Amino acid sequence: DLREVFNALRWLVRAGAPWRMLPNDLPPWEAVYQQSRRWLDAGCFEAMVSDLRSIIRVAQGRQGQPSAVVMDGRTLQSSCESGPRAGYDGYKRKRGSKVHMAVDTLGHLLAVHVTPADEQERAQVHKLCEAVQQATGHSVQWAWADQGYTGEAASKAAQGNGIDLQIVKLPEAKKGFVLLPRRWVVERS
């Protein structure tokens, strides 16, 4: 039964357990693994997330697909085992990976790209914009980002995907933490 296979997959994700540790009241781990690979290869989970995102947006009185996104990157500290995959982020003073993400204005995840921490945010604009347009059916027209995305190359990369990149800057007289307009939704994601 596919429902039991799906329940087993949900249990694995929730428990963080290896395949072979599935409880005996669920289907055999081999069957669950094979079916989950089929679902992953067919893009079932991406389609499910896209449909749910559209339903939530319509329920909140918005269009099904977003017209604007917010982009940001965050550095995640790595462990010793990550080896050469980890880079050093001089600004955050951390060794690890950098997660670049794009969310819609409600905070729903649209695209994720992981790089070593020493990669610049502005260099990832093309891949993020490409993934966003693919996920939304080319409905996105605007993107807001922080000052890590400044530069002509980043702007051209976004324009090449039909997106107008707008940088939200920190007010000049302010010091310390300042809540920037349109940027807070990505910080909570």
Language-model segments: residues:
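Short alpha-helical elements
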Residues: 1-189
